[in-house]
Amino acid sequence: MGAGKTTIGRQLAKSLTVPFYDSDKAIEESTGVDIPTIFEFEGEEGFRDREQKMIQQLTKLDGIVLATGGGVILREENRRLLKENGFIVYLQCSVDRILERTRRDTQRPLLKADNPKDRIEKLFAEREHLYLSCADFIVDTGIMQSKAVVNHILEEYKSANR
């Protein structure tokens, strides 16, 4: 959430000349409604069910870059599918930087809170250990420009696939 998954993912896919997929966008395209609407009518659990089905579909595709929503890591099946079918990059970013990047974004249901900073910190506390346990590579997107992040990922990916 706000770490740069879509921005970095698109640039990475372009550099690798492979298709880019965003699981949240794919869910919106398949349902015809946006993520906040899914949360409103189905709740987070309903959204997570849809997300898991989409991850099952997308991880069957070869030679793609996939950006997932930040909560995809919460379900064990998603973690298994991602680890078995890809090179996982954790785009790490500080709470303050994420808050700065998302403060005007109205399309993030989990940040609709009286105190968004507290909410982000709570999400980090719930998820960070899962991100770290799944990651093949970790890069801090809060301290580098996106092009430098992409180059760093490319170097690591190429060395891991020799």
Tell me the role of every PLM-derived stretch.
Residues 2:
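Walker A (P-loop) phosphate-binding loop of P-loop NTPases
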Residues 6:
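Walker A/P-loop
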Residues 10, 77-80, 100-104, 151-152:
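Short amphipathic alpha-helical segments
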Residues 11, 15, 61, 87, ...:
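NTP-dependent small-molecule kinase module
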Residues 22-72, 76-83, 108-109, 121, ...:
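ATP-dependent small-molecule kinase phosphotransfer cores
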Residues 70-72, 94-96, 144:
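Short glycine-rich anion-binding loops that position phosphate/pyrophosphate groups of nucleotides
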Residues 84-128:
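A glycine- and Lys/Arg-enriched "phosphate-lid" helix/loop adjacent to the NTP-binding pocket
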